[in-house]
Amino acid sequence: MIRKVKPEIRVVGFDDGTFSFSSKVAHGRTILVGVVMKGAREVVGVLSRWITVDGTDATEKLIDAVVNSRFKDLRVIMLKGVTYGGFNIVDLDKLYLETGLPVLVVIRKKPDLRAMEAALRKHFPDWRERFEVLRRAPPLFELIPGKLYLQTVGLSPETAAEIVRTTTKTGLIPEPLRLAHMIASAVMTGESTKE
């Protein structure tokens, strides 16, 4: 449990790289990058794993990256959403239980669960299992009305908000997530894309 959020709190923020339609059809892969930071000030490391586009391995790859890393002083796992590589959905409870670390999801747009369910029904034989993972995710709360939403497992909304403020240098997105996005997109396309 996090009692006080220190300016140098150790966090890892994960985001995925871009992928093409052909990689979806061929069940290709995309990279998942985690940037380990002390607050918003110092990058101390980078983690990476390859995940299957529209697969079911994102949760296991995240667990593996965190548990088997040399960074044993991590306090929080940050995610930029719960779907990676298309519909490779992260089970937030499992990630929390198997790593022992609180999970903080940061998103800019409120997801449309009905549209997600419709897409899952249309494209995936295992749509029920995938949708159940989405449905079990904790409720969203607005940090900045209409602009920034959070989901948490193992953190109070107040502590989560404080962690976001502590780890954000510029803009709305915490620095570990912003950098993870840039690195992952550069690996996949040869150049970083804007957050």
From Swiss-Prot:
Signal peptide: none annotated. It comes from the Archaea. Pfam families: DUF99. Gene3D superfamilies: archaeoglobus fulgidus dsm 4304 superfamily. Belongs to the UPF0215 family. This is UPF0215 protein TGAM_0348. It comes from Thermococcus gammatolerans (strain DSM 15229 / JCM 11827 / EJ3). The lineage of its organism: Archaea, Methanobacteriati, Methanobacteriota, Thermococci, Thermococcales.
